UniProtKB/Swiss-Prot annotation:
The gene coding this protein: rpsQ
UniProt keyword annotation of Ribonucleoprotein present: yes
InterPro entries, sorted: NA-bd_OB-fold, Ribosomal_uS17, Ribosomal_uS17_bact/chlr, Ribosomal_uS17_CS
Protein's name in the database: Small ribosomal subunit protein uS17
The organism of origin for this protein: Geobacillus thermodenitrificans (strain NG80-2)
SUPFAM superfamilies found in the cross-reference section: Nucleic acid-binding proteins
GO cellular component: cytosolic small ribosomal subunit
Length: 87
């Protein structure tokens, strides 16, 4: 039996939870500028499947790549790493 291929796992912040069973996660990464060598921050939003609607806006979550679940959803929620602090 062959081993399952490695899936991408990202940690990001939930920026929207208005959709049913779907969250929008903002993932920030750093890349080195090719000429000047300075670290530049890049951000990208991913839609992820949240089966039980447990993630809320501001939470830090871990998402994993999965089969296409809709036209835009390619990730699913693995765990809520840190709950948002409500002031």
């Amino acid at each position: 039996m062959s081993e399952r291929n490695q899936r991408k796992v990202y940690v990001g912040r939930v920026v929207s939870d208005k959709m049913d069973k779907t969250i929008t996660v903002l993932v920030e990464t750093y890349k080195k500028h090719p000429l000047y060598g300075k670290r530049v921050k890049y951000s990208k939003k991913y839609k992820a499947h949240d089966e039980h609607n447990i993630a809320k806006v501001g939470d830090i979550v871990k998402i994993m790549e999965t089969r296409p679940l809709s036209a835009t959803k390619r990730f699913r929620l693995v765990e809520v790493v840190e709950k948002a602090v409500i002031l």
